[in-house]
Amino acid sequence: MKVIIAEKPSVAQQIAAVIGASVRRDGYIEGNGYAVTWAFGHLVGPAMPEAYGIEGFRRENLPILPETFILEPRKVKSGKEYKPDPGTVKQLGILHKLFDKAERIVVATDAGREGELIFRFIYQYLGCHTPFDRLWISSLTDKAIRDGLQNIRPGSDYDNLYRSARARSEADWIVGINASQALAIAAGRGVWSLGRVQTPTLALVCQRYLENTSFTPQTYLRLKLHTAKDATAFAALSTERYYTKEEAGGILKTVMETGCVRVTKAESRQIKEQPPLLYDLTALQKDANTRYGFSAEWTLDTVQALYEAKLITYPRTGSRYIPQDVFDELPALLASLREHPAFGTHAAALAGAQLCRRAVDNEKVTDHHAMLITGHTPGKLTPEQEKVYDMIAGRMVEAFSAPCVKDITAVRLECAGIPFEVHGTVVESAGWRKVWCEKEELHEDEAAALPPLAYEDTLPVRGCDLVEKQTRPRPLHTESSLLAAMEAAGKELEDEAEREAMKDSGLGTPATRAAVLETLFSREYIRRDKRALVPTEKGLAVYGIVKNMPIADAALTGGWELALSKIASGDMDAFTFRKGIEVYASQIANELLKVRIETAGEHTGAKCPRCGGQVVFFQKVAKCRNAECRLTVFRTVAQKELTDVQLAELLTKGRTGTIKGFAKSDGGTFEAALTLDGEFRPTFVFENRKPGKTTGRKTRK
């Protein structure tokens, strides 16, 4: 008898149907010489410190560096304790009996790093010695399963992948346990969570938030000159910015008096915008968040459901390319979309056409190729599932369509010695951009079309306006932008090729990034504000402590991810990686243990409005660190305790938004904004009323 183990029951049922196993037993399906069984994700994992005889959080226990990791069944909370999950223990017993009876085991867990680890941990925990082979497939269609079973590989072919997965698991344990315990000991209270990937990700959110909220916008002016040629009117913006209306107004007057503008440069060129690459998981999550506001976790769950419904190929992929043999199947896949209400016409137009090969590269396909549809006709999908399916299908049509051809014109003009500029864009052939029919937004110095212009052309000045603008901070992170930052280990990369090159050294992997974000939400370190990600006071407090430590360094953590990739490819030894992680974790624990307990709950980042120094937030007050200034602002105003965010707004922007819940003397409450008076004391601001000073009274206990 052969035993096939899948990652979850639903996949086991599909495999059983293909091989003709139909007799349902407790925990497996039997028939035709097979027993098809399943895990429920990670049934087994590294044990907590208590398994090594280490109780509680004690300074002398750190760092905790097990020589050999103990594995134990998944635990669930029961009262105040964690106990082995009864369902997990039962299924492990079933697996043990099946493995002992089997001639060979076929591993059919997800074909990736975590799927490999799920099986290997079970195999190791059970002390099993039955030989095993690997089923490695990229979709769950009947054909893919049959072909995969005809081409199973020896399990040993994936030993390096397992070593990489185990190294990742152990590294997360070593860093997470030691850092979290060290911080809890230093703080002297509460439970704190730090992690190898979650902490630098939190740092990215906090850095952007503090940069955004402390930004002081600057107003500037640009001249907008109106002119025309051959009945085609257009406008050009001054290249210079002006910071006073007097200066800008004087120049505007001069321009109007001059009456004509001269072309000093007119260059036209044709460009071909290549179609976008196919989706990997992170790219899909980013676009789904930008387009529909879907969270990374929701998108992952949705594509997993589409995969199990045989509608798309393996979703947890990190590649945006396909190999040549898959490209050969593209005409049939595109033909399956001919009746699609949105993409049918475009898919039909590609029949017999020369398909773009930009996304075809055998060398850039690792474990799995980019996401594609399978050609199966979708049944009943939820509206949200349909949107995600259409994104994958639409991207497939885009990726193999012709380039978008544009004529780009760059024009420089001069009037009274003042330079102006305008850019024109005309789409000659929409190519792949026809698929979604989305219009590109024009930049402020861009026109949809320009008349033919030549050097030394003289045009009339038909008008000139002052356009008032403000400098803007970089926006708060959304899940989309944070996923991009994680992929690039915190670097701002716009170029697609540069992003591809950074993939192996990002924070986490495509399969784990959504879980990292959800961990930050569940720990209450970050929250959603519409689509923006905002750190909580707790998250800012943690960041304030670790921001200058290696554990918050995105690039350093990205380097560890690159090392894990090298272990998987056989280019690095797992033992060397483990020793490096142990040194790293020991350094982090030592640094955290040196943190002064009194600062463990502080939040810094606001600047002092009086001297420009650093302000530190305590439980009851905010104080300037500058010994000569020592500005103090009490947190409680009219029995209302201000949050860290409100204090930061008051100190950095000089005014808060409207705050509810201030106490009246007669027992009622009122709402008002707060500003600072000339002596830097909080003052109420009421709409249509004059400011009045606060009492700064403490909240009644």
Q: Where do the language-model regions lie?
A:
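C-terminal or mid-to-C-terminal helical accessory/interaction module adjacent to the motor/catalytic core
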Residues: 87, 100, 142-225, 268-269
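Intrinsically disordered, low-complexity regulatory segments
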Residues: 1-169, 173-175, 473
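Conserved short loop/turn motifs at secondary-structure junctions
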Residues: 1, 110-111, 188-193, 268-277, ...
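Accessory interaction regions appended to the cores of large information-processing enzymes
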Residues: 17-23, 47-48, 54-55, 154, ...
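Amphipathic alpha-helical transducer elements in NTP-driven molecular machines
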Residues: 9-16, 33-36, 40, 59-62, ...
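Basic, low-complexity terminal or inter-domain segments flanking catalytic cores
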Residues: 2, 81, 88, 125, ...
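Metal- or metallocofactor-binding catalytic centers and their adjacent structured scaffolds
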Residues: 243-279, 285
